[in-house]
């Protein structure tokens, strides 16, 4: 068995100049290594781009951007037992399954009283919020009750069936689209199944909202977290969830982040609560040429990554919302890049 000596420069070191080919060597005899057959070149799928043609496929429009889309409660109200996916896969250029964002799928789950539904999915993280109703879930042989206002999170490998004692609707978000993109199967749980009871979440939110200066903050909210997420401080290692209130006659100033938000609106008045979204701020920190999304109680909408967004309540009634994001993953990757208008290092525009 012979091994060719590595090429050396005049100084005696290995020559790493890629424009100089390797010196000719004797053909490799694969039989000496215990193999049969011939080499393949694996070049059929190789492509080469000049840098400026492929450095920013999102900005150039080659990769579709996440759209702003709104979903009303009519798509699940008075429907039979079933899952109603908020599917934007066609707009996102995703052809291997349903998706609301590149990494997440949000759905409304409707369960008629006395009926049940299986929600097993290949995902590392699942989050359920109970819009209304009550019942119990059987998860890997264990039973847990749920009712209006509860949050439930399930880890990888969970087998779940939900049973409704009353007419029930839930908002369900999971990361199956991310797993499909990676070609992976979720097997190892990264957290334990967890329930965030309505009474506990509401009590914490009311405590925060009643503190002096609460309305001076960017958001009046509770961030739900799991004790296993010591670095990201999020509800799972992939998902992030906020339970917030938009007080009467208040504005919550613009901020932005690189995670996609799948926003669920709870008890908003019929009109007067809305979100403004845009890509730039003016010198006063206001969104330039904003797109307006009027809130619908029981509805949802998407907030694309990187867009400034601010919430407004022009009524005398508070409104509640639950944004859910892939910010757990983004935080782990150190790519969340959240910015607030009051930050001194903010560069407008």
List where the protein language model places each region.
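C-terminal functional regions that serve as terminal interaction/effector modules
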Residues: 6-8, 12-67, 78, 260-349
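Intrinsic, low-complexity N-terminal interaction/targeting segments
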Residues: 98, 103-108, 117, 126-127, ...
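Conserved metal-binding segment of the jelly-roll/cupin
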Residues: 112, 145-166, 173-176, 292-315, ...
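Conserved short histidine dyad/triad with adjacent acidic residue
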Residues: 83-95, 104-122, 240-260, 307
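A short beta-strand-loop-beta hairpin characteristic of the jelly-roll/cupin
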Residues: 112, 116-148, 265-297
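Hydrophobic alpha-helical segments and helix pairs
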Residues: 161-198
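Short, low-complexity cationic-aromatic patches
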Residues: 27, 39, 97-101, 115-126, ...
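A short, N-terminal "cap"/entry segment at the start of jelly-roll beta-barrel domains
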Residues: 2-101, 183-243, 346-349
């Amino acid at each position: 068995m012979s091994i060719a000596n590595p090429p050396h420069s005049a100084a005696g070191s290995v020559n790493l100049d890629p424009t100089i080919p390797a010196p000719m060597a004797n053909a490799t005899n694969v039989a000496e290594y215990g193999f049969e057959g011939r080499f393949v070149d694996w070049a059929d799928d190789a492509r080469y781009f000049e840098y400026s043609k492929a450095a920013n496929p999102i900005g150039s429009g080659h990769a579709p951007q996440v759209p702003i889309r709104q979903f009303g409660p009519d798509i699940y109200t008075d429907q039979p037992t079933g899952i109603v996916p908020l599917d934007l896969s066609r707009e996102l250029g995703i052809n291997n399954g349903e998706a609301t964002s590149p990494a997440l799928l949000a759905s409304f789950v409707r369960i008629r009283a006395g009926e049940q539904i299986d929600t097993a999915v290949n995902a590392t993280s699942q989050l359920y919020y109970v819009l209304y109703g009550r019942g119990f879930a059987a998860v890997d042989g264990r039973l847990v009750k749920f009712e209006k206002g509860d949050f439930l999170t399930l880890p990888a490998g969970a087998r779940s069936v939900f049973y409704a004692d009353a007419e029930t609707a839930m908002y369900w978000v999971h990361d199956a689209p991310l797993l499909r993109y990676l070609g992976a199967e979720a097997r190892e749980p990264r957290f334990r199944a967890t329930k965030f009871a309505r009474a506990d979440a509401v009590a914490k939110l009311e405590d925060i909202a009643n503190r002096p200066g609460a309305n001076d903050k960017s958001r009046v909210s509770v961030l739900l977290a799991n004790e296993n997420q010591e670095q990201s401080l999020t509800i799972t290692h992939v998902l992030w969830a906020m339970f917030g209130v938009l007080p009467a006659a208040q504005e919550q100033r613009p901020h932005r982040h690189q995670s996609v938000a799948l926003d669920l609106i709870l008890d908003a008045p019929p009109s007067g609560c809305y979100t403004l979204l845009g890509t730039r701020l003016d010198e006063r920190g206001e969104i330039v040429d904003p797109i307006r999304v009027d809130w619908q109680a029981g509805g949802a909408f998407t907030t694309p990554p990187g867009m400034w967004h601010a919430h407004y309540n022009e009524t005398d009634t508070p409104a509640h919302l639950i944004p859910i994001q892939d910010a757990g993953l983004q935080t782990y990757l150190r790519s969340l890049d959240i910015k607030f208008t009051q930050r001194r290092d903010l560069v407008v525009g």
